[in-house]
Amino acid sequence: MANSSFIGDHVHGAPHAVMPEVEFPDQFFTVLTMDHELVTLRDVVINFSQEEWEYLDSAQRNLYWDVMMENYSNLLSLDLESRNETKHLSVGKDIIQNTGSQWEVMESSKLCGLEGSIFRNDWQSKSKIDLQGPEVGYFSQMKIISENVPSYKTHESLTLPRRTHDSEKPYEYKEYEKVFSCDLEFDEYQKIHTGGKNYECNQCWKTFGIDNSSMLQLNIHTGVKPCKYMEYGNTCSFYKDFNVYQKIHNEKFYKCKEYRRTFERVGKVTPLQRVHDGEKHFECSFCGKSFRVHAQLTRHQKIHTDEKTYKCMECGKDFRFHSQLTEHQRIHTGEKPYKCMHCEKVFRISSQLIEHQRIHTGEKPYACKECGKAFGVCRELARHQRIHTGKKPYECKACGKVFRNSSSLTRHQRIHTGEKPYKCKECEKAFGVGSELTRHERIHSGQKPYECKECGKFFRLTSALIQHQRIHSGEKPYECKVCGKAFRHSSALTEHQRIHTGEKPYECKACGKAFRHSSSFTKHQRIHTDDKPYECKECGNSFSVVGHLTCQPKIYTGEKSFD
């Protein structure tokens, strides 16, 4: 552009997301064109509200500043004697430096109220500007009046046909008695007095010039968001001419009754309305499950196809969903972004934090419909419900045994693999289950944290305490379905049922003899190994069965077991 400006030199670095906070005085940058009529920058300024400004992208905001600068330059160029003149505006006393013509800078006594405009800040007592940033700062009120009124010159970019003879100028402008050489020149000159706004909108009665850049604000009435649709051939919503603008006013728009959101096409209403009416139009071809949104169906179908498109670059593990990969990567990075506000414990996954916080709140939102027992975690309820249904979905591929829980299957499989990942630091004994190690360590520590409230006896294990308490209560919850006999322990019922089935699962590898009970099998094996772990303190003799040791003191005392 030919002229530098109060904004033009400093806006193209990076258009800001926040609209500039500037308000023009009523007579700001007013140019006296023919000693009579004033053309002000306000006549040609394009105003945006905050909401409209946010819809513009960086390219559109740059274009906005270009249009503003061009309009301002056009006003200045109307009365210059030379097109090569240089004008420079700066903040302070020397506001305008000009060569070739005389200019006067004056303070405006009146501020305009441009409601809804992006130029909002009061100009009074504002004179500072940050020339380094993209935002427009505050400028002094000023009015530029031309003392020299040279002959009329058109805009630099406008090329008009010239007539060589003065007699060939039939077009006369009555107000100034100026004669022009052609109708185009005459029309363009008339726009000086009308602000260059020959096109009027029949919806809002706003006027526009032929410059298509002025159409930036035409989306105000329709709610069309700039740079979102490409129906009009050129870039986004910068419409070519006034006819396109009129078309928008006449175009039918479709509104979602529930959400009060407006759409340009009826096809765009349907997906949003499905959210309100609960319709599920997208059905999975594998399992028949339906979804309201197609993206949800696509995500779901990865379960059936076993498609895993997201790979961890650290360990190569694949995942179906990006969120799963993100959570997994925190294992490698050690990141735990979710912190408990009660105990400051941290977690990798937000769902873990939510479940943990229920320990502090006591919330148990998942209740069993069969027995009413409540749980703080959904998966605990799922495991519990299998007690009522008898469902055991996890099967051991080695022996065919089935389990209700995946963790039980994992522990069982270690019997076949011999894996014992949990090792005691005191005696280096290894265990296949972590809870077994915890119980074992209490042998070394002597800890017995579980106390019977009836007799005060302590136990290392909760299961031992529960079994003991049944002695006081007489409870025998495990009943044989064949003969009706009841037992305090589930293991006792299991061994009893083998009497009816004839099952003897414990077989001696040395002689092939089979046993119903593991204790009987252990005693028998000591015959082959000659193991005698029970020693008499009186005589030093050892025995393979503890019962023989119990009878030994009677030999020394002469006590008779039977009368």
Swiss-Prot record:
Transmembrane spans: none
UniProt cross-references to InterPro entries, sorted A to Z: KRAB, KRAB_dom_sf, Znf_C2H2_sf, Znf_C2H2_type
Protein location: Nucleus
Coiled-coil stretches noted in the UniProt entry, renumbered to this chain: none
GO molecular function: DNA-binding transcription factor activity, RNA polymerase II-specific; RNA polymerase II transcription regulatory region sequence-specific DNA binding; zinc ion binding
Cross-link Glycyl lysine isopeptide (Lys-Gly) (interchain with G-Cter in SUMO2): residue positions: K87, K268
Zinc finger (C2H2-type): 199-221, 254-276, 282-304, 310-332, 338-360, 366-388, 394-416, 422-444, 450-472, 478-500, 506-528, 534-556
One BP annotation, GO: regulation of transcription by RNA polymerase II
GO CC, one annotated term: nucleus
Positions of the KRAB domain: 39-119
Keyword list, A-Z: DNA-binding, Isopeptide bond, Metal-binding, Nucleus, Repeat, Transcription, Transcription regulation, Ubl conjugation, Zinc, Zinc-finger
Coarse class of the protein's main subcellular location: nucleus
Similarity comment: Belongs to the krueppel C2H2-type zinc-finger protein family.
Biological role stated in the UniProt entry: May be involved in transcriptional regulation.
Protein name (database record): Zinc finger protein 529
Organism of derivation: Homo sapiens (Human)
Taxonomy of the source species: Eukaryota, Metazoa, Chordata, Craniata, Vertebrata
